[in-house]
Amino acid sequence: MGFCLFANVAIAARYLQKTHGVGHVAVVDFDVHHGNGTQAAFEDDPSVLFISMHQDPRTCYPGSGYDFEVGDGPGRGYTLNIPFPPGAGDEEYLAAMEQKVVPKLDHFKPEILLISAGFDAHGEDPLAQIELSEACFGEMTEQLVRVADRHCGGRVISALEGGYNLRALGRSVVRHLVGMGGN
């Protein structure tokens, strides 16, 4: 369906629900590509909030993740797609975090927060046309950790999803891990 044979974070979300009794799971995906597999897994499920920040689907594979895709049936309103035009950068992403992502998470009050941490939205990555810096990845991570501290006892799981410029990937992962630690 997408870049991955298995949607690792979607599998983890369902595992946490079925095996550990977690009720409400939030998934935030900031990979440059829309998380179509995760969205498909939960689009009719109100127990999982899925938020994807990605490049405009008219300009980037897989061609899904329009802002009008909000979930189906009982899951309507539990999918938030935030597509960005080519050339968008830190300012646009951080504004979306503050104005859309964090308020949606605060309203949902997850019991655990899962991050699909793709770093191919970095400005040096060759695969797409989003211009994020490693500092932006760190700030987004810190904001997500603060949400987890407020609502789920700091429970956050992050899974590496993508990044194709190894230098930019390395710097971004380091900044993300620092953000995960709250420093």
Predicted regions and their residues:
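A short helix->loop->beta-strand "cap" motif at the edges of active sites that frequently abuts
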Residues: 150-155
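Short active-site-adjacent structural elements
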Residues: 122-125, 165-169
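Flexible, low-complexity linker/loop segments at domain and module junctions
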Residues: 143-149
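Short, electropositive alpha-helical surface patch
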Residues: 133-134, 167-183
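Conserved alpha-helical scaffold segments that buttress catalytic/binding sites
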Residues: 1-143, 177-178
